[in-house]
Amino acid sequence: MAITNGYCTLQDVKNALRISDNVDDTLLELAVETASRQIDDHCERVFYQTSGATRYFVPRDSYVCEVDDLVSITSVKTSSAANGTYDVTWATTDYQTEPNNGIAGGISFPVTLLRSVDRYVFPISGGETTVQVIGTYGWSSIPTAIKYATILLSSRLFKRMDSPLGVAGIGDIGVIRVSRIDPDIDALIAPFKKIRMA
């Protein structure tokens, strides 16, 4: 099998596990892809790119619209009648992308928010999608911490076959229970998790 949208390579994991043969390559590739999707789930975002995608959003208010992670924007349109027809095309001078300077918390981030400027406002209509954004979604490159977390998680998933039912024996220490998410992996991906308000 080939890895689809993996955040590390097969060779990265083989190097980490000190594996030089190709006997388990299919299982290792499965571990990489599974680890990558688990990281997506934990972070509530994807780091791979989808080019030329059209997505629709509900603005937070008349001036702010949160969007999926964007590497580049081709067009922004709004539906003035909230009827699914996106009839108002915005110029790049009609909105500001955030985070400012592409940095959030000291980390390079893609665009996650559009703020209206000048004379345009985002139409609000009872929670309906009134904003259409066409562009390249995802991240320009996989963050180093995400790549390393994927290597660790892929290795862990692969080694689970040697660890029955989440319990591992360690020499003189005895038996230890394997936790749900490795604290090191959690610490690596924490800055990239979307924060949700209830």
Please describe what each predicted stretch is.
Residues M1-A198:
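Divalent metal-cofactor coordination and adjacent catalytic microenvironments
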